[in-house]
């Protein structure tokens, strides 16, 4: 028994240890199994959603530097990016993430799209002359309009090089934004129109006259026809034909006939010319300044300062001819052409003054043109002694043309260059090209074709492209063609008017000064021309007679040179004198007691050198403007 008892105790302990060990092993294994079960990775399905977003809303959805997209990703927990398509009007927004996050992101994106206002586009047309005001310096004004309205504003450039009368302005934004932008643009147009009207009102007409009265048509000249002519005038409207020539705004400054008139370009140079004329008038109105710039010798082709007797102002002019005064053989008159306006007039040589060199900085503004596509209804032509021909217009046709163009009243017209012709304005002068243009009066009611109105009223007939025809010669018989009968030009008692003076502004003879003879002079009644408002006193020095006036330049050694254009020209003449030597042509029987009338080829060359041709300068500017625009 004792032996069994001794064995039982170890056996019991052994069984206990085995049991405990087994239990511990089971517990440890069970725990490891549970831990392994807890470490199992849960796999979730990734969703991808594609949303079509209009291209106009994509920038707003992305936000500046992606701020809106980052905010949506943070709120939803999904990843968002875009696929762009150039051939579609929408982009694709790709949303990736768990089902719940992608659904939330999709909801946020759709809500954002619904909250966006409708983006639309509109366009309006504005006059081309207002584009500068709308755009501003360096685009300052158009950027300000976009900033204040919130809409995108763009002034469209013409597709062709043609300079059109209207430009297209496009707006892009909401309806409210576009309305604000349109009001701002219309305000710019109104301001520019007001500025142009004020600027035009500051340019007084170069004559004092009443408004133009309607002119009867050739077929019927009674009062009823007058009224009917007015109705026709307001009813005849034409659209400009599609041509390749540039359209430019011009003023008609002087008219000889529809076949010969002068225009000025509308632009900043107009104000510069007005300032120049005001300065010249103020300067040359002072007696001491006129005495300082007295011309001791006047030559053909010389650019001078001359007073225009119809308004008393001083202008730049060129001497085209020197002739004796028909009323005083001891006086000479110069046939001058006003380079900035196109008028021509006879002025006493002692009333001309030297033109300061600084007054030549502004180019001459008058450009000679002819009305393209029309001919006189009568088909008559005038012929000069040299055989040159030009169209002869009825005086009332010229008056009607002046009324339609509002000559010298600074009404802006649209011109389109159609053709050119070669012509010479003086006998022996080199031919130059004169542009043939069509004129249109653009109003709110429509466009009025001046040439078509003349044809409709019977003053002209439509014709093909004009063939080259020389302008009226500037000889001693008919120096101004259609204006040869003008009282201003021919110094006679009858005739018409100056090229920029209307029919209701005629001379009454008060401008002719009668010089009563004294004991030392002949008792015959002698008249001498005197400019209105010129402020020039009677000259005390003995004037040159027709027998001794000379077309050559004065001798620098005998005449003191003054500061101005003569200093520059004198240096050029000296250079020519060193290079050219031609014998003087002497008339066969000169007067014994008078200097010889000499006119050499050298003199002709010098005179041509002294001329500053405004027409070619304007033609070059016309060509450049067409390409620049």
UniProtKB/Swiss-Prot annotation:
Keywords: Differentiation, Membrane, Mitochondrion, Mitochondrion outer membrane, Repeat, RNA-binding, RNA-mediated gene silencing, Spermatogenesis, Transmembrane, Transmembrane helix. Residues 297-362 form the Tudor domain. It is a single-pass membrane protein. The keyword Transferase does not apply. It is found in: Mitochondrion outer membrane. The keyword Membrane applies. Residues 198-240, 464-526 are annotated as: Disordered. Coiled coil: none annotated. Residues 46-109, 119-185 form the KH domain. GO terms for molecular function: RNA binding. InterPro entries: KH_dom, KH_dom_type_1, KH_dom_type_1_sf, SNase_OB-fold_sf, TDRD2-like_tudor, Tudor, Tudor_domain_containing. One of its GO terms (cellular component) is P granule. The Tudor domain specifically recognizes and binds symmetrically methylated Siwi and Ago3. Interacts with (symmetrically methylated) Siwi. Interacts with (symmetrically methylated) Ago3. Interacts with PNLDC1/trimmer; interaction takes place on the mitochondrial surface and recruits PNLDC1/trimmer to Siwi-bound pre-piRNAs. Participates in the primary piRNA biogenesis pathway and is required during spermatogenesis to repress transposable elements and prevent their mobilization, which is essential for the germline integrity. The piRNA metabolic process mediates the repression of transposable elements during meiosis by forming complexes composed of piRNAs and Piwi proteins (Siwi or Ago3) and govern the methylation and subsequent repression of transposons. Belongs to the Tdrkh family. This is Tudor and KH domain-containing protein homolog. It comes from Bombyx mori (Silk moth). The lineage of its organism: Eukaryota, Metazoa, Ecdysozoa, Arthropoda, Hexapoda. The gene is PAPI.
């Amino acid at each position: 028994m004792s032996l069994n008892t001794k064995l039982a105790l170890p056996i019991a302990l052994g069984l206990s240890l085995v049991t405990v060990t087994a239990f511990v092993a089971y517990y440890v294994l069970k725990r490891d199994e549970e831990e392994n079960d807890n470490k199992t990775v849960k796999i979730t399905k990734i969703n991808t959603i594609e949303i079509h977003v209009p291209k106009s809303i994509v920038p707003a959805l992305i936000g500046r530097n992606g701020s809106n997209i980052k905010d949506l990703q943070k709120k939803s927990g999904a990843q968002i990016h875009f696929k762009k398509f150039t051939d579609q009007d929408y982009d694709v927004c790709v949303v990736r993430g768990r089902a719940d996050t992608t659904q939330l992101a999709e909801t946020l994106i759709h809500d954002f799209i619904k909250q966006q206002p409708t983006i639309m586009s509109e366009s309006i047309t504005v006059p081309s002359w207002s584009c500068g005001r709308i755009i501003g310096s360096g685009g300052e004004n158009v950027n300000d309009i976009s900033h204040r309205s919130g809409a995108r504003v763009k002034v469209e450039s013409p597709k062709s090089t043609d300079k059109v009368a209207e430009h297209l302005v496009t707006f892009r934004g909401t309806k409210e934004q576009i309305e604000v932008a349109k009001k701002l643009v219309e305000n710019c147009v109104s301001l520019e129109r007001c500025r142009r009207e004020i600027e035009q009102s500051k340019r007084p007409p170069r004559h004092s006259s009443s408004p133009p009265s309607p002119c009867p048509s050739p077929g019927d000249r009674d009062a009823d026809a007058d009224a009917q002519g007015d109705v026709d005038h307001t009813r005849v409207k034409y659209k400009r034909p599609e041509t390749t020539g540039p359209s430019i705004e011009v003023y008609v400054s002087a008219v000889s006939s529809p076949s010969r008139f002068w225009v000025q370009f509308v632009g900043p140079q107009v104000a510069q010319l007005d300032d120049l004329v005001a300065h010249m008038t103020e300067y040359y109105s002072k007696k001491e300044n006129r005495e300082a710039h007295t011309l001791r010798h006047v030559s053909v082709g010389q650019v001078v300062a001359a007073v225009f007797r119809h308004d008393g102002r001083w202008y730049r002019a060129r001497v085209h001819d020197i002739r004796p005064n028909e009323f005083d053989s001891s006086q000479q008159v110069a046939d001058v052409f006003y380079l900035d306006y196109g008028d021509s007039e006879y002025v006493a040589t002692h009333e001309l003054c030297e033109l300061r060199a600084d007054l030549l900085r502004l180019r001459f503004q008058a450009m000679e043109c002819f009305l393209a596509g029309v001919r006189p209804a009568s088909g008559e032509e005038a012929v000069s002694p040299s055989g040159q021909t030009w169209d002869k217009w009825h005086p009332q046709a010229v008056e009607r043309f002046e009324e339609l163009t509002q000559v010298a009243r600074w009404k802006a017209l649209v011109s389109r260059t159609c053709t050119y012709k070669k012509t010479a304005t003086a006998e022996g002068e080199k031919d130059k090209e004169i542009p043939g243009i069509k004129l249109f009066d653009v109003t709110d009611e429509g466009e009025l074709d001046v040439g078509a109105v003349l044809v409709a009223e019977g003053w002209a007939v439509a014709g093909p492209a004009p063939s080259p025809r020389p302008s009226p010669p500037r000889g001693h018989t008919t120096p101004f063609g259609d204006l040869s009968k003008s009282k201003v030009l021919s110094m006679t008692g009858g005739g018409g008017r100056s090229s920029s003076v209307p029919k209701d502004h005629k001379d009454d003879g008060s401008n002719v000064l009668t010089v009563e003879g004294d004991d030392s002079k002949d008792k015959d009644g002698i008249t001498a021309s005197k400019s209105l408002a010129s402020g020039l006193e009677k000259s005390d020095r003995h004037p040159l007679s027709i027998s001794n006036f000379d077309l050559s330049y004065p001798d620098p050694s005998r005449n003191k040179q003054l500061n101005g254009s003569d200093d520059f020209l004198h240096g050029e003449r000296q250079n020519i004198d060193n290079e050219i030597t031609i014998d003087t042509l002497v008339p066969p029987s000169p007067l014994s007691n008078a200097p010889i009338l000499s006119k050499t080829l050298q003199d002709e060359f010098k005179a041509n050198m002294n001329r500053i041709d405004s027409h070619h300068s304007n033609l070059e500017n016309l060509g450049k403007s067409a390409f620049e625009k």
